């Protein structure tokens, strides 16, 4: 069975194609993505209207490229992200998916974007046991308890202010490094000293929430450090600032992720979202999981950021388990919860 997935929740227009065999195994046939990232760069973040227009312009070319890569004229099913995400962006992808499904005469499946990140993190793994997922991106920082791919997940904790990826973008802008901040800071951090500056770790006291996150204090601390240096006429090491900031973020993320695994008795940690491509996060997560006897499952780099493969993969796994197709009337939901069925 050939399943095509469309992703358009933010600034990437993604179309992925997977092949599902009778045993439930998946093979990636196509992964086509167009990003409007550079169009948002001068604004320092994603502008919803620009993102929606970019999806409209990119959808057909990206679809054609995905079908070319897959070597198929049409799939056996079409899936699309219907939430959470930017309202206009979601409408473009979901509407396109419904139109293609109707034109091809194949079933349509509505997919939860966050469930897609979990599914792709387990794409190359064995059957998923009880697990915890750490989803980290520009819009989300969440710890989720996962019993099975595609089923409702329980939120154990989330950020109380900035998402981790958002903090990267804001610190990058503060340092004059550009957008998006994640890859830039990660690259510079490799040349810096992560212990040079003692930036704070939010919500790490015993009295604090065990599974929630906070990055606004860290962001403010970086700003004050830079302002103080400029006021005193000191030359700062941008590399050291990046390394120390990144260490603080990754320290908190991995510490709380492993703690969550222990608290719920999970032996697998799934890492997903755009920030999952961060080299230090992957390294520290592996170190701490090894010490805690927890298996870490991380998607390949190109599948960390938003893509259509993860949507196709989640739909395919649920189809294999007998999921019914979605009504063509199903709407989009920018605030869709993880605690709902992931394909509906």
From Swiss-Prot:
InterPro entries according to UniProt: ATPase_NBD, Gcp-like_dom, KAE1/TsaD, Peptidase_M22_CS, TsaD
Q: Where is this region: Disordered?
A: 325-344
Cofactor: record remark: Binds 1 Fe(2+) ion per subunit.
Catalytic activity as recorded in UniProt: L-threonylcarbamoyladenylate + adenosine(37) in tRNA = N(6)-L-threonylcarbamoyladenosine(37) in tRNA + AMP + H(+)
Gene Ontology CC terms: cytoplasm
Q: Name one GO molecular function term.
A: N(6)-L-threonylcarbamoyladenine synthase activity
| NCBIfam families attached to this UniProt entry | gcp_kae1, T6A_TsaD_YgjD
Gene Ontology biological process terms, A to Z: tRNA threonylcarbamoyladenosine modification
Query: What the protein does?
Result: Required for the formation of a threonylcarbamoyl group on adenosine at position 37 (t(6)A37) in tRNAs that read codons beginning with adenine. Is involved in the transfer of the threonylcarbamoyl moiety of threonylcarbamoyl-AMP (TC-AMP) to the N6 group of A37, together with TsaE and TsaB. TsaD likely plays a direct catalytic role in this reaction.
Q: What is this protein identified as?
A: tRNA N6-adenosine threonylcarbamoyltransferase
* HAMAP family documented for this protein: TsaD
| Required cofactor(s) | Fe(2+)
Per the UniProt entry, the Enzyme Commission number(s) are 2.3.1.234
The beginning of the lineage is:
Bacteria, Bacillati, Actinomycetota, Actinomycetes, Mycobacteriales
Major localization listed first in the record, in broad terms: cytoplasm
Q: Matching CDD domains, A to Z?
A: ASKHA_NBD_TsaD_bac
Q: PROSITE patterns in the record, alphabetically?
A: GLYCOPROTEASE
Q: Which residues bind Fe cation per the record?
A: 113, 117, 306
Polar residues biased stretches: 326-344
Q: Quote the record's binding site residues for substrate.
A: 135-139, 169, 182, 186, 278
């Amino acid at each position: 069975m050939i399943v095509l997935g469309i992703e358009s929740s933010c600034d990437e227009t993604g179309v992925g194609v997977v092949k599902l065999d009778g045993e439930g195994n998946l093979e990636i046939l196509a992964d086509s993505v167009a990003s409007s990232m550079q169009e948002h760069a001068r604004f320092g973040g994603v502008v919803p209207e620009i993102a929606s227009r970019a999806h409209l312009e990119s959808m057909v070319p990206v679809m054609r490229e995905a079908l070319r890569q897959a070597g198929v004229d049409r799939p056996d099913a079409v899936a699309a992200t219907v939430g959470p995400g930017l309202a206009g962006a979601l409408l473009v992808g979901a509407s396109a998916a419904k139109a293609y499904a109707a034109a091809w005469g194949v079933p349509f499946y509505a997919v939860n974007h966050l469930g897609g990140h979990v599914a792709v993190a387990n794409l190359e793994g064995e059957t998923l046991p009880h697990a915890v997922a750490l989803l980290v991106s520009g819009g989300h920082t969440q710890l989720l308890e996962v019993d099975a791919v595609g089923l409702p997940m329980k939120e154990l904790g989330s950020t109380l202010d900035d998402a981790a990826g958002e903090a990267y973008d804001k610190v990058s802008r503060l340092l004059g490094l550009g957008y998006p901040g994640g890859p830039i800071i990660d690259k510079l951090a490799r040349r810096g000293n992560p212990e040079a500056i003692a930036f704070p770790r939010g919500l790490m006291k015993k009295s604090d929430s065990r599974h929630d996150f906070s990055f606004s204090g860290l962001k403010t601390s970086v700003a004050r450090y830079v302002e103080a240096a400029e006021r005193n006429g000191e030359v700062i090491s941008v590399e050291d600032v990046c390394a120390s900031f990144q260490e603080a973020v990754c320290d908190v993320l991995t510490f709380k992720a492993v703690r969550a695994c222990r608290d719920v008795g999970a032996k697998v940690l799934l890492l997903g979202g755009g920030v999952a491509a961060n080299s230090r996060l992957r390294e520290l997560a592996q170190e701490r999981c090894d010490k805690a006897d927890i298996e870490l499952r991380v998607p390949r780099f190109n599948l960390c950021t938003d893509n259509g493969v993860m949507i196709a993969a989640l739909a395919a796994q649920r189809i294999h388990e007998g999921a019914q197709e979605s009504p063509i009337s199903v709407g989009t939901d920018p605030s869709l919860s993880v605690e709902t069925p992931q394909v509906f």
